[in-house]
From Swiss-Prot:
Highest taxon listed in the record's lineage: Eukaryota
PROSITE patterns: ACB_1, ACB_2
Keywords: Lipid-binding, Transport
UniProt source species: Saccharomyces pastorianus
One of the record's GO molecular function terms: fatty-acyl-CoA binding
Protein's name according to its UniProt entry: Acyl-CoA-binding protein 2
Record's keyword annotation contains Transport: yes
Domain ACB: 2-87
Gene that produces this protein: ACB2
Amino acid sequence: MVSQLFEEKAKAVNELPTKPSTDELLELYGLYKQATVGDNDKEKPGIFNMKDRYKWEAWEDLKGKSQEDAEKEYIAYVDNLIAKYSS
């Protein structure tokens, strides 16, 4: 189960004044999924479904990382994005 701070940071991402880059969003996605679900056990999307494939890869890259560590990294990453895009 994720912490209240994690949930607050997940909401804060949507309130950034500037949309993060695609790479930043993929990093967030992977960390979010690893923190909330754990290791990726989904089938890799087909080659013609690039958006879902990139998201799958971002999550797959974190396989083996504990949900707690992923949550901590997600919170720190969001804090960095807030500092970057709110100044």
